[in-house]
């Protein structure tokens, strides 16, 4: 714990959520969440979760904050910024936890961030207006699980697609009538890709030279992502301030890079590589077609 930053809380509050309380603190204008109460509330193992938080402290900005705990005694509490809470929550796969805590985990994933955010921005905690039950959203979660498995996405990325498509901040805000539409949308993404869908094939309007430039740019982004992944373990080992950025740049853009690949493939189907002004970076085109990412020496 010596390498963990220690901060002094300016203001602490217990925010009610799901019949329990979540301990929060304000430090230098940033809202933090005490993690042990959250872990205990859900029913997870604190020992395993604190190990993950310590191992990935740069990603989650995990710090110790001197604050008044539940027993009214002042002590150091391990915390992460509120804005990082969803990232941690969605790092836990509901299908891999005990059945008796699965629904509670899902409820935290879908609602907790919004409740805490409302508290610190509006001065009061309000549960989002419920439109569907956890059981009613089960088919959608199953579809998301399939999307994550088939497309190798992270859960926040998969849920973000639904949020953007239906203009909501969480799937809990979906109307009951929207659930089947969301499930159909996710299934279509799994089968056909988000930007391909069932649309009629359009004539390519890019020249071979223009297409080559975009493919080259995609290839640089793809290989840069792999480079950041390679750098992260070394940066973390020397406790570099850049380790967090290396982790983020190595992981957070994978979804966009994948979407860009789908768009490029869809718009370059008719490109003749034998044209005089055609592709010159053939290796980049091969990596695009094969969805190739340079191999990593590390496992993430």
Swiss-Prot record:
Domain of life: Viruses
InterPro entries: Antirepressor_Ant_N, Phage_P22_antirepressor_C
UniProt keyword annotation of Transcription regulation present: yes
One Pfam family here: P22_AR_N
SS bond list: none
Signal peptide: none
Keywords: Transcription, Transcription regulation
Function: This protein prevents the prophage P22 c2 repressor protein from binding to its operators and also inhibits the action of other prophage repressor proteins, including those of phages lambda and 434. The synthesis of antirepressor is negatively regulated by the protein products of the two other immI genes, mnt and arc.
Name by which UniProt lists this protein: Antirepressor protein ant
Organism of origin: Salmonella phage P22
The gene coding this protein: ant
